């Protein structure tokens, strides 16, 4: 299923929040991503319709497909971040740059970075 950058950011955010707490709330997602609650509501609707998340009215949950996709996006983020840090980029910039790069680098470039990072 095709997603866009925004959807990937939401899935990654929900994954990270769910690792910190059993329950993820829309307001936490809005705060972490830096968007309005109506923007989160719109994204939740689209991600629910795509089968990536479920919502019980208060809490957001990743479906199996959503968790799998979010984990792949986050793994990509981590490899890029680690690659940048290995090349002297400070941790804060490496993390910020990885957020941008994870959406636009080619699979070949990602695989090269992964091979380099994993040794």
Regions found by a protein language model. Give the residues of each.
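Basic amphipathic alpha-helical segments that dock to polyanions
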Residues: 10, 29, 40-48
């Amino acid at each position: 299923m095709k997603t866009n950058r925004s959807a990937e950011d939401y899935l990654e955010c929900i994954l990270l929040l769910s690792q910190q707490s059993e329950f993820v709330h829309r307001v936490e997602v809005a705060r972490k991503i830096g968007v309005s609650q109506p923007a989160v509501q719109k994204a939740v609707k689209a991600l629910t319709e795509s089968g990536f998340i479920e919502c019980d009215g208060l809490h957001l949950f990743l479906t199996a497909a959503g968790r799998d996709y979010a984990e792949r996006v986050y793994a990509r983020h981590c490899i890029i971040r680690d690659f940048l840090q290995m090349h002297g980029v400070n941790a804060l910039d490496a993390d910020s740059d990885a957020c941008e790069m994870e959406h636009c680098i080619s699979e070949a470039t990602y695989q090269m970075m992964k091979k380099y990072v994993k040794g």
